[in-house]
């Protein structure tokens, strides 16, 4: 599960700023992914503009389900890790 999330972060082209990724759409999707109160149905509505076939839809459902199956502590740690990445020295907005 943690490896899957790492691969997701590696494949996303990230333009980082001091708070969040710098892309409100990406931030919203990440928040929806790690928020255990967002149901699978609501999550699919959130990502619908970016899912163009049933193969991708199935992968996205499985990905969200991985987060729904995790403990609150694990999901909280993913949020901390995401913020640490976005706020890291190598991800700072140029002055």
From Swiss-Prot:
A GO term for molecular function: steroid binding
Regulation: induction: By testosterone.
Cellular component aspect of the GO annotation: extracellular space
Tissue specificity remark: Expressed at very low level in ventral prostate.
Alphabetical list of PROSITE patterns matching this protein: SCGB (PS51311)
Pfam families attached to this UniProt entry: Uteroglobin
Signal peptide region: 1-18
Subcellular location: Secreted
Family in the record: Belongs to the secretoglobin family. Lipophilin subfamily.
Protein role: Part of prostatein which is the major secretory glycoprotein of ventral prostate gland. Steroid-binding protein; can bind non-polar steroids, cholesterol and a group of small proline-rich peptides.
UniProt-recorded name of the protein: Secretoglobin family 2A member 1
Upper taxonomic lineage: Eukaryota, Metazoa, Chordata, Craniata, Vertebrata
Designated gene of the protein: Scgb2a1
């Amino acid at each position: 599960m943690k490896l899957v999330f790492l691969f997701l972060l590696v494949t996303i082209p990230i333009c980082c700023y001091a708070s969040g990724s710098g892309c409100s759409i990406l931030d919203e999707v990440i928040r929806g992914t790690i928020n255990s109160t967002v149901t699978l149905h609501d999550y699919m509505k959130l990502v619908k503009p970016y899912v163009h076939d049933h193969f991708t839809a199935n992968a996205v459902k499985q990905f969200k389900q991985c987060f729904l199956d995790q403990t609150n502590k694990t999901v909280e740690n993913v949020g901390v890790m995401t913020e640490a990445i976005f706020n890291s020295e190598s991800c700072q907005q140029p002055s």
